[in-house]
Amino acid sequence: MIKFLSALILLLVITAAQAERIRDLTSVQGVRQNSLIGYGLVVGLDGTGDQTTQTPFTTQTLNNMLSQLGITVPTGTNMQLKNVAAVMVTASLPPFGRQGQTIDVVVSSMGNAKSLRGGTLLMTPLKGVDSQVYALAQGNILVGGAGASAGGSSVQVNQLNGGRITNGAVIERELPSQFGVGNTLNLQLNDEDFSMAQQIADTINRVRGYGSATALDARTIQVRVPSGNSSQVRFLADIQNMQVNVTPQDAKVVINSRTGSVVMNREVTLDSCAVAQGNLSVTVNRQANVSQPDTPFGGGQTVVTPQTQIDLRQSGGSLQSVRSSASLNNVVRALNALGATPMDLMSILQSMQSAGCLRAKLEII
């Protein structure tokens, strides 16, 4: 009976633990994307391009491009173009990208163009931080937004000054890679955690032998690998598919001060406390009054005098009791019972943490 209970308890503990693959928790150091950027022109717009009188760089770029094609524009020519726009083009060079491989690009207007819908990006070199050209971009732009205007009225859905070209750039230069050089590789945790780093190292050592992996710090695990690209690929494939029991995360509440959004994980708990939140509202009313002379022939003139009225109201918040909560559902239910807006909730959570009632780290972004 005792053995059965022990086995049952062990089974419950193992079931409660959440297992994840090492590939979902880590990344290989040095295997990363690299940002590319370029400046180009979009043509073929339906009268929604840059106003060239206000964006002289668009005209200058067009003149330079035409001169490279053997077309000379007379000096002093004032070109009134509406179907051309100057844009910035960005892309990410993937790890192990090879010549001839295509990547997606994002096109964004940098002038006063109204829309890039229906436009075509002309050949644009994409450079890295070393000013070397790694890809060439060109193609038709796909804009996700929509808009129309007529008679002084307009309507717009989403953004029209940016778009995307799927497979719009071709890689022309490869980045040198250090993969396969040396007998060690570093795995980097997505989030720093000493216990998780040690647990991953222990899992690799159990399967590959003691000394195969060492946790260097809270984010880095050094792994001994065989030499050669093909051997390291097979070795990493086996390691990344190993299962690791994920320990509970640190309780954390993230507050976005710009949008007022509040996000918390399931480890957040509350202690018993009492909360009172008062609302302060300020109302400003401004009205223009017309003052005229009493008699039409008595002199004077008609003037407009503004009248401003400011009202200040503060509604007293009642003291609300918040019970101790051990689960995320209970925490959400307790906070909703306060009836506070997201902006009020930010102040309440900060005060709760200062009072020691919020058992979590508070991060404001």
UniProtKB/Swiss-Prot annotation:
Superkingdom: Bacteria
GO CC annotation, single: outer membrane-bounded periplasmic space
GO biological process: bacterial-type flagellum-dependent cell motility
Signal peptide range: 1-19
Predominant location: periplasm
Gene Ontology molecular function: structural molecule activity
Keywords attached to this entry: Bacterial flagellum, Periplasm, Signal
Subcellular location: Periplasm; Bacterial flagellum basal body
InterPro entries: Flag_FlgI
Subunit structure: The basal body constitutes a major portion of the flagellar organelle and consists of four rings (L,P,S, and M) mounted on a central rod.
HAMAP family: FlgI
Cross-referenced PANTHER family: FLAGELLAR P-RING PERIPLASMIC PROTEIN FLGI, FLAGELLAR P-RING PROTEIN
Family label: Belongs to the FlgI family.
Name this polypeptide is given: Flagellar P-ring protein
Species annotation: Escherichia coli O127:H6 (strain E2348/69 / EPEC)
